[in-house]
Amino acid sequence: MRLSQSVLTALLICVNSAAFANVEVTLPSNSELVLVNGKESDSTDKLTLENGENQLALRYIGRYQQQGSQTQFSSDVIIMTFLAENTSLTIALPRIRSNSAADAFNRDPKISLKNSSEVDIAFRQDKLLKEGMQLGRDYEKEVAEYNSNNQVASVAALAPSITALVQAKPVVIENHGQPKNTINQSDQVNVGQMLDFWYQQADEETRKAFKLKINSKE
C-alpha cells in the first residue's frame, strides 16, 4: 500500500511539530538555577518548558584568579522572562576573571538568549534583591511577591491569587460583646458542688444568712 505524497508531507509535519511541542532551554555551566516559574527545579543544564511566557531565576557562579589567590564569585539572583514557542534556546553568560568584572556584572548583568539559529530572543531582565541577611532566603516567597508588584520582569500569572493570600493570613475576630473571663460549664458544676458542701456543713443561722445573701443577688 503506497502513501500519497500529501499524506507523507502531513505525517512529516506532525512529526516535526511533535519534536518541538515545547521550549527547551540550555543553561550555561557558569550558572546556578534558582527557580523556574516561581518553583524550585532539580535541572542543572537543560530545561523543558511549556510554550508561552516563562520566568527563570538564576545567578552567575564561577572562580577566577585575583592577585595570586582563588576567588569564588556568586552574583545577585537574576530574573529573566521571555516568550517562546516550539523552539530551542540557549542562555549565555560572560566569563568573569577579576573583581572589577564581577562588580560590573552585579551592577548590570549581561546575558544573552539565542535560538538554534543564533538569533537573539527578546527577554525582560531584573534582579531579585533583599537587604540584610542573605542566608536562608525564601526565594519562592520573594518571587511571588515580586510578581505581585508589577515589576520589570514580573509575570502576572505567577502571582499568588487573592484567595491564597486570604488563606495565608487568617483574620482573628474578637467578640467584644461578651466578657473575656467566661466560666465554662464544668467550672460551674464544680462551684455548685462546693457551695452545696459548705451549706451542708453550716449551722442553721449561717444557712439563713446564706439564703438571704443569695436572694438579695437575684
From Swiss-Prot:
N-terminal signal peptide: 1-21
Alphabetized UniProt keyword annotations: Signal
Top-level taxon of origin: Bacteria
A Pfam family recorded for this sequence: DUF2057
PANTHER family referenced in this protein's UniProt entry, alphabetically: UPF0319 PROTEIN YCCT (PTHR38108:SF1)
UniProt family annotation: Belongs to the UPF0319 family.
The protein, known as: UPF0319 protein swp_2242
